[in-house]
Amino acid sequence: MFWIAKTLIAFLILLKTDCYKIAIPANLIDEVNPVLEFVDFRVQVIPYETKPLWRIKQESFKIVGISIENGLFSVCNCLILGASAIILPEQYDGHLAAAAIVQSIADNTNVPCVSLHLSPPTRPSTHLHPHLNAKSLAVAAFIKREKWKDVVVVFEEPDELLEITDMITAGHFDPDSFSSQLVRLKHGDDYGNELKHIKNKLDRYRIVINIPLQKALHFLEQAANMSMCGVLYHYVVMDMDLVTVDIDSIRGIEDCNITSFGVHDVNSEYIEDIRQEIVHKSSIRLPKKGVPYTTSIWIDTLRLLIRSMKSIQIWDEPRCGSSWKSGSDIKKRFFENPLAGISGDLHWAPSGERSNYTLHVYRRTLSFQKFAEWSSRTRRIASSEAVVIANSSEKLTLEGKHLKISVYLEAPFVMITSNGSYEGYCIDLLHKIANILKFTYTIQKVRDNAYGSKESNGKWSGMVGELQRGDADLAVASLTISYGRSEVIDFTVPYMHLGISILFKKPRIRDSDWFKFMDPLSTQVWIMTFASYFVVSVAIWIIAKISPYEQFERDEDNGQYKPVDNQFSLRNSFWFTVCSLMQQGSELCPRAASTRLLTGIWWFFALILISSYTANLAAVLTTRRMETPIENADDLAAQTKIKYGTLGRGSTMSFFNESKIETYERMWQLMSSSPGLFVQSSKEGIARVKSSDYAYLMESSMLEYAVERDCELMQIGGLIDQKGYGIGLPKGSPYRELISTAILRLQEKTELTELKEKWWKDKSVVCEQPKRKDQDDGESIGGIFIILVVGLVLTAVLVIFELITTRKPSPAQSQVIRHVNVIPSFKLGFFRWNVN
């Protein structure tokens, strides 16, 4: 145990005349041997003309231990054996002193020393890793490219926190517009508490994971079990080997949206060719895609060292205490001999570090696909044309996916049957879309029974909130597309167009009205007509009194004027105008031009009035009209008797709240001042309309459904606004275009129209409509008979009054009285004639 704790295991490439010898740590012999087998194969294919092919033989491998107490002797002993290069191991934590000894001796003797460790020891050594903060810079560039405003960064060890600090520093993020939250994981494999904290407390959906690969996979698997996958959540995994993992084999992670990085393009033909060589010529175990990061660094390091040594003539051997001349040549060739390595093109900076390297950026929705590259030279992420073309060849599909569907119960869109299953317009629509795109789904009712509105704490309720939190993949309901919602979720194209309208109860058809013949003219017109009749009658009487042509008549024989009786007495004037109004003739005829002018104007007035009355009377008597106290939203806003309101949440309420139109502003002021005007459901609003003087402002689609099934309800006016229903998806969902295309396809085939006909039209309900009447039953004009009877009675009373008030009969009256005695003779003659 003491030896393990105090010993650094170094890999020594030993130079002999017939082979290279390499010392390998005992605990890594099984891992490294396959790599050396592959390098042996790669060296064999390098042609040389001046000397025979040098080979690496597995049986020549040797283990060399360098202790801290005896470090100088151990290294010098290795050099005596002919070591031509030293490779420091991948891990030497706790042995920094021994590593420093090896590095110092290598520098003094000029023996090439290459480190497999990501970070160099106290003295810089040559290594093939990208810079220590390369991943941090790449992640920072990705966050800025995506314009994220907040992230959660997950880590476990202090050195991982150091990389995160580098990331935040390198990003130069504006503290006013960007925030990050650090979450340190406890040791172990259970991350449930940390995930609950992220989901419920932090309420953030962009998570950077900087932990080892296996731990990262456990973290993602547990996140998937807590419904923290899907297009809403986005994970950035900093481990370089994630892209080589068959992630679809891990339950639940296949739905996670993940971005990761790698040193090579796992989908390139070059990497695939190398993979095939490794598989066929060695026992290295490789994943299904790409080459693991550590393996690629191993292979590139050995290949570059061997190529550098084989490119020169080595005449001397290294010795402790002296500088090895051939070592300088090997180092020079090492940096001057570029290599297209598995870990990328190898270029070097003067400091001995890699430069001009590229990290490939992968995004996973269906599978890991390269979509961009990060360059160490520009420190930016850019999508090359080749990457764009490659990505365009990947066909996005929902086939085989299983989606969680959030629904809101609202007839006829979504309803529950007696056996607990769902039905309705939206359910049929979802089924048709699923058949087109070949996905399966599970339906879940929205927990808080709301469409979704922004709360005072900035969070969204209802289906919108579930999409934001990742609790649902789709929201399929009568979900209105609005500006506020579209800022936090995505919508498909509208599957139905609609607007806000007014639901009101039908007025009762007025019972039999014997004075209906007065309806063609309003009360005001009747009053004005009688007033005109009185004024014109008096005017004719006055003008006739004044005009000389109504007092005298020209004698045609001698041309002299002789006085005559004025025919337009006050009584005759009223009689004359009423005869004209009733379009009847009279024995009176005006003589003067003034009276004739007034008479002509009165006749014109009577003509228009009677014509209008006749036309309106025909319509009134043939159709039973239902009179409503309001005709549109303006009428509703202008009165106070009929109360009105909307659903207490949702887009209709938001429309009136945000409207700048004066009428709707007044309506909102009234509604907001009386919270009792709002209802909790459309069912409650409809019941309130039927039971009281209440108008319910609702979306026309549900209004049509209610009117179709209840003959007591009706729509008032047209649409107040124009909008549409769409299917909701999480923001940035790649499936929006697929589902929108499916909706357009159904629309083109008129299947959406058929669905509406199916769910809106109720053939069992037939509402009686006002009908035209071919015959009048007398109910509408019975009043004229009443007027006739009253007129006869008044006439009889009047004639009796005239007889009583006249003391001495005039000659004419006496003649009439005498004629009364002949009535019996008239009756007798009538009966005789009838008998004959």
Curated annotation (Swiss-Prot):
Residues that bind L-glutamate: 478-480, 485, 651-652, 699
Regulation of protein activity: Activated by low temperature of 18 degrees Celsius in ASER neuron.
GO biological process: detection of cold stimulus involved in thermoception; detection of temperature stimulus involved in sensory perception of pain; modulation of chemical synaptic transmission; synaptic transmission, glutamatergic
SUPFAM superfamilies: Periplasmic binding protein-like I, Periplasmic binding protein-like II, Voltage-gated potassium channels
SMART domains hit by this protein: Lig_chan-Glu_bd, PBPe
Subcellular location: Cell membrane; Postsynaptic cell membrane
GO terms of molecular function: glutamate receptor activity; transmitter-gated monoatomic ion channel activity involved in regulation of postsynaptic membrane potential
One Pfam family of this chain: Lig_chan-Glu_bd
Cytoplasmic topological segments: 545-600, 802-836
TM region positions: 524-544, 601-621, 781-801
Result for mutant: residue 121 to L: In xu261; abolishes cold receptor function. Decreases signal transduction during cold thermoreception signaling in intestine and ASER neuron
Gene disruption: observed consequences: Abolishes signal transduction during cold signaling in intestine and ASER neuron.
Gene3D superfamilies per record: 1.10.287.70, 3.40.50.2300, Periplasmic binding protein-like II
Topology of this chain in the membrane: Multi-pass membrane protein
Record note on what altering residue 582 to R does: Normal cold receptor function
Key word Signal present: yes
Similarity comment text for this entry: Belongs to the glutamate-gated ion channel (TC 1.A.10.1) family.
PANTHER family registered for this protein in UniProt: IONOTROPIC GLUTAMATE RECEPTOR
Protein name, entry field: Glutamate receptor ionotropic, kainate glr-3
Organism: Caenorhabditis elegans
